[in-house]
């Protein structure tokens, strides 16, 4: 970081704390029900009356963003763990204060070494909706109903995981425990499931959460179910969405501006014309 600062650069790290690798020491320890890390992830038993590890035994019918079930059976523990993304990326249990403390300690470690901030991967998925007994929607005995299953045979977990009930609490706690007393840092959150109106609250400096968010309505509106089946660009609708972003933060907060990222098709191919070198260059300049 020091050498970057000498060149007038700021170092913003990618921070992934909704989940870890399944090879992380925390997860390896969590496979043991008697270990202090036992409750650091979302572990659940097979549904009653089913055989663990067999189709239909998953705790609920949630599907993964990457396809298939959002639950993976772990023979060592004899239970399933939740992964909204790859089975190699088990979700951390942010309801556990020890998990949050470990995350904050890690963030402080990097800031103490000169990092200038964090781009927080899917940070708005850290708070899951549960009933009063801690059960997820659709789980056996849960008071919360799940959504209907789709064509692939799974339900959508996003309404129960995005912008969850304790998200503001967690982000404000992070701000206090990591950034209080520091100056010159940046926090920007990747925010699936967050509206422009909620962006105002989260990025309002008075609420002490994040500085900026990456919202996705403007890069999702032209897709027919999947980003790989784009519809023709509706420019008036695009302009309306972008204007809505700005209007929502006219009194407080910040809007971020981007037209694509590593999860999106390249913008020249998507909204421009790359059929020839000339049209590709013109499109790239325009976009």
Task: Map each language-model feature to its residues.
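Active-site and adjacent substrate-binding regions of carbohydrate-active enzymes
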Residues: 1-287
């Amino acid at each position: 970081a020091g050498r970057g600062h000498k060149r007038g650069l700021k170092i913003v790290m990618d921070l992934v704390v909704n989940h870890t690798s399944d090879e992380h020491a925390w997860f390896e320890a969590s496979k043991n029900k008697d270990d202090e890390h036992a409750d650091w992830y979302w572990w659940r038993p097979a549904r009653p009356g089913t055989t663990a590890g067999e189709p239909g035994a998953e705790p609920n019918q949630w599907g993964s963003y990457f396809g298939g079930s959002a639950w993976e059976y772990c023979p060592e523990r004899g239970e399933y763990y939740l992964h909204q993304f790859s089975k190699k990326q088990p979700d951390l249990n942010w309801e556990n204060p020890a998990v949050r403390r470990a995350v904050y300690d890690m963030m402080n470690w990097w800031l103490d070494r000169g990092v200038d901030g964090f781009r927080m991967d899917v940070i708005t998925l850290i708070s899951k909706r549960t009933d009063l007994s801690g059960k997820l929607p659709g789980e056996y005995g849960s008071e919360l109903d799940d959504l209907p299953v789709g064509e692939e045979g799974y339900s959508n977990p996003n309404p129960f995981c995005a912008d969850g009930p304790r998200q503001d609490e967690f982000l404000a706690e992070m701000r206090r425990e990591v950034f209080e007393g520091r100056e010159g840092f940046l926090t920007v959150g990747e925010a699936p499931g967050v509206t422009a109106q909620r962006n105002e609250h989260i990025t309002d400096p008075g609420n002490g959460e994040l500085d900026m968010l990456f919202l996705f309505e403007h890069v999702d509106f032209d897709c027919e179910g999947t980003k790989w089946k784009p519809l023709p660009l509706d420019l008036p609708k695009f302009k309306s969405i972008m204007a809505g972003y700005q209007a929502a933060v006219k009194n407080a907060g910040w809007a971020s501006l981007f037209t694509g990222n590593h999860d999106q098709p390249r913008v020249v191919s998507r909204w421009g014309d790359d059929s020839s070198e000339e049209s590709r260059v013109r499109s790239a300049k325009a976009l």
